[in-house]
Amino acid sequence: MSNDSSKAKQNQVDEAVEGEILTESEVETGNDEASLMDELTQANFRVEELEQALAEANAKIEEQKDSVTRAAASEANIRRRAAQDVEKAHKFALEKFANELLPVIDNMERALQGTNAEAEETKAIYEGVELTLKSFVSTVDKFGLKEVNPHGESFNPEHHQAIGMQPSPEFPANTVMMVMQKGYILNDRLLRPAMVMVSQGGSGVDTQA
């Protein structure tokens, strides 16, 4: 009987010990889970912080890109305007210089018209002026100065200025029959219109402009 009682007590002791072991195991497991959840929570917070920092960094990068782009565009505009200003200044200076040269050309042409090329006493003068004029015209031609000498051409109000109209059986109506003064174009821009007499055709009355 005593043996049965002892066994029963031993079983109770064993069950109690086993229960304590299970309880401790459950406590440890619960602690581990709580610790893991805490670590996961901290990790999530850290990830959110890093994502926010990355977003801010990307925003700053985009802002810097915009600043660089605007600065580059501004510099390009400044360069373009400077180039345009230089070009305008160059054209203005060239145009002013060309305008100063036109009377010189006109005077040499008038000198040729008023000099007898066949007379011995004036032949050398004529040839000298003619050679100088050709050289002069050739030089200014290199800078884009072209003469407008429309004799026999149709009247063009964009390049010609009519000083009058006359009947002419030789020239069709609205044709330049005489060039009173040559015009000039500088780099495709009209510098001075040609002063011309325009034909009315085979009949009509003289009309002065």
UniProtKB/Swiss-Prot annotation:
It comes from the Bacteria. Residues 1-13 have a biased composition (Polar residues). GO terms for biological process: protein folding. Pfam families: GrpE. InterPro entries: GrpE, GrpE_coiled_coil, GrpE_head. Residues 1-33 are annotated as: Disordered. GO terms for molecular function: adenyl-nucleotide exchange factor activity; protein homodimerization activity; protein-folding chaperone binding; unfolded protein binding. Residues 15-31 have a biased composition (Acidic residues). It is found in: Cytoplasm. Keywords: Chaperone, Cytoplasm, Stress response. One of its GO terms (cellular component) is cytosol. Belongs to the GrpE family. PANTHER family: GRPE PROTEIN, GRPE PROTEIN HOMOLOG, MITOCHONDRIAL. Participates actively in the response to hyperosmotic and heat shock by preventing the aggregation of stress-denatured proteins, in association with DnaK and GrpE. It is the nucleotide exchange factor for DnaK and may function as a thermosensor. Unfolded proteins bind initially to DnaJ; upon interaction with the DnaJ-bound protein, DnaK hydrolyzes its bound ATP, resulting in the formation of a stable complex. GrpE releases ADP from DnaK; ATP binding to DnaK triggers the release of the substrate protein, thus completing the reaction cycle. NCBIfam families: PRK14139.1, PRK14140.1, PRK14150.1. Homodimer. This is Protein GrpE. It comes from Shewanella woodyi (strain ATCC 51908 / MS32).
